[in-house]
C-alpha cells in the first residue's frame, strides 16, 4: 500500500488529557481531519488540533459514514486521525475499520494509548500481579448485545481465581456478581469499581462481591466504569519480588548472599 494513503488510529488515553502519548498528541496537532469517539474521549484533547482542522464526532455516526469521511479525506491528500478512547486494541472496534479501509488501498498506523484499566489501578494504587497472590490478569466483559464465546463466560473465567478486569459491565453489576460467585470467587473477594478513571469527576467504590452491587447503585454509577476483582486489591499476604532481592542474582547484579 502507498504509505501516504493512511489513517492514523490514536489511543486518546483514559480521560486526563495529559495522559495521551507525545506521539498521539503530535498526530492530533498535524491532522487535517479528526474523527473522535465523542461519548468517551475528553474534548480537551481537541484543543491540540489545527485551527482549520475538520472535526467529526463519531458518536452519532455509523461505520459506513465514518469510513466514507476517512476515504474522502485520504483521497484529497489530507492527514486523517481516528481518535479512540483508552488504547484502541481493547474494545476499540478497530479491526473492522482496518479491513474496510484496506478495500480502498488505505493503510493504518496505530498509536497506542493508556487504557482506563491502568488509570484505574493507578488511582487505586494497586499492583495487578502480586507474587504468590496472582500472576494473571483477565481482561473481559459480560455478555450483552455482543455475545460472548461459550468458553469465555464470566462464570468459566472465574474458575481461575486470578485478577479480573471487567469492562462494560457496571450496568449489569448484579449479573456480574452472580456469575463470578457461581464461578468460584468467594463472596468476600475484594472488588473495586472505578468510574471515569483519571477524569476530574472520577469516583472509586470499594467493597466485596457480597456488597459491591448495592454500593455501586447507591453511588448512581451506571456506565463508563471498570470493575476490578481479586485478592490483589486487599492481600492478606504477598511475597516481595525476587527481582530486587539482595540474595537474587541476575545478569545486571551480583548476589549479596553469603555462602
Curated annotation (Swiss-Prot):
PROSITE patterns: SUMT_1, SUMT_2. The keyword Amino-acid biosynthesis does not apply. Pfam families: TP_methylase (PF00590). Keywords: Cobalamin biosynthesis, Methyltransferase, S-adenosyl-L-methionine, Transferase. One of its GO terms (biological process) is methylation. Its EC number is 2.1.1.271. It catalyses: Co-precorrin-4 + S-adenosyl-L-methionine = Co-precorrin-5A + S-adenosyl-L-homocysteine + H(+). Signal peptide: none annotated. Pathway: Cofactor biosynthesis; adenosylcobalamin biosynthesis; cob(II)yrinate a,c-diamide from sirohydrochlorin (anaerobic route): step 4/10. GO terms for molecular function: precorrin-4 C11-methyltransferase activity. Belongs to the precorrin methyltransferase family. This is Cobalt-precorrin-4 C(11)-methyltransferase. It comes from Methanocaldococcus jannaschii (strain ATCC 43067 / DSM 2661 / JAL-1 / JCM 10045 / NBRC 100440). The gene is cbiF.
